[in-house]
Amino acid sequence: EPSARPTSYIIYKAEGQGGFDNGTIVNTTRCQMQLEPGKLYHFKVAAVNAGGESFTTETLSVLYNPAASKSVLIVNNFHRLASPQVVDDEEKQGFDLNQDPGVSYGLTAGWSGKQQVFDRSRMGNETSFGLGFSGNEMIGKFVAGNDFNYVQAHATSIAASGKYNISSCSSEVIASGRVQMKNYQAVDLINGLERHDGYTHAFFKSFTPALQNSIRQYASQGGRILISGSYTGSDMQTEEEQAFLSDILKLSYEPTGSTAITRDINPEDSTVTERDSIVCTSPNVKGLGLQFSYYNELNAQHYAATHPEILKPVGNYAFTAMQYDTGTSAAVAYKSTTYRSFVMGFPLECIIDERTRTSVLLGILKFLTD
């Protein structure tokens, strides 16, 4: 609420895998504290006034490693909170959980089931054929949403290598220029489920124009960047946005369900037969010498990447670095003499197995920085 001005702040701190402390009260927006070298710290902040305490901010992490020669900046760009996909036209109305289940603040048990009837003409019909009728498959089930702690998950994996210093920030300070990516040997951008859905009151976007400009500038300065998230391609549909994807990230977006031509070769006479096939993704991925799965269906443990994307390499020096089980491209890597990038079609933090997630992240950083 804009008129709710804070009079003080509470800084909560956690060390390593430990829980957060009871907080330290500060009266200004600046604070200095002594941190031990070699120890990973996590912070979140709440605002306070006579009316009480706010929700806390996203969790940010920091590590000073005296033996490290390289520094990684983790940038959180996953701030979205949203209802399921709104359907509202002359013929249909409702919430389509299959199209987009939305993003709750943390856990929610708010759904009885997926809406099955969207026909406006059935409004007022209180039977299973009436507008808004839903299933009951989700009764009593919790669904994980945005916990705002994914910087912590990435930082924990990076710290396991013992090779890097770690800093972190919100994407807003990157877009505003307050934090310069050029000061870091690699940037890890967390996009999560960030996208402009067209119906949420707040504006969310995978790459705002300001963030695009910051990434362009970082690339021109020889930057090394990892980007992971669910809507890298589908949220960038204007001519200028698609130029950013192809010119800077060296990729193009292929919609799931589109038709591609598959060429079958007869091993006996080498004749080629062409046929149409439907391109699709899978919750199983192979890449970097590993095979793994990510959260693809709604569950109580972690938010799900229900709409991963197919990202195809564009131009010289770009190549497919991960594949879904269906054979389609799950990630695009680019390595030239000027800059490097690695873009995934699903959120890295959604990889289910923690050890595998750490191996994937460290493998990508090795590609970017070695």
PLM features: residue spans?
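A glycine-rich, often tryptophan-bearing local segment used as a flexible ligand/cofactor-contacting loop or short
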Residues: 193-300, 360
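Helical hinge/lid and interdomain linker segments adjacent to catalytic or ligand-binding clefts
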Residues: 113-244
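Extracellular ligand-binding/catalytic regions of CAZymes and related secreted enzymes
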Residues: 67-148, 219, 236-237, 243-258, ...
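Extracellular fibronectin type III
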Residues: 37, 48-69
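Recognizes extended acidic, P/S/T-rich segments that occur
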Residues: 5-38, 51
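Catalytic beta-strand/loop cores that center a nucleophilic Ser/Cys/Thr
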Residues: 260-353
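Active-site-proximal beta-strand/loop segments in catalytic clefts of secreted hydrolases
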Residues: 75-79, 169-172, 189-194, 221, ...
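Hydrophobic/tyrosine-rich beta-strand signature of extracellular beta-sandwich/beta-rich modules
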Residues: 41-45
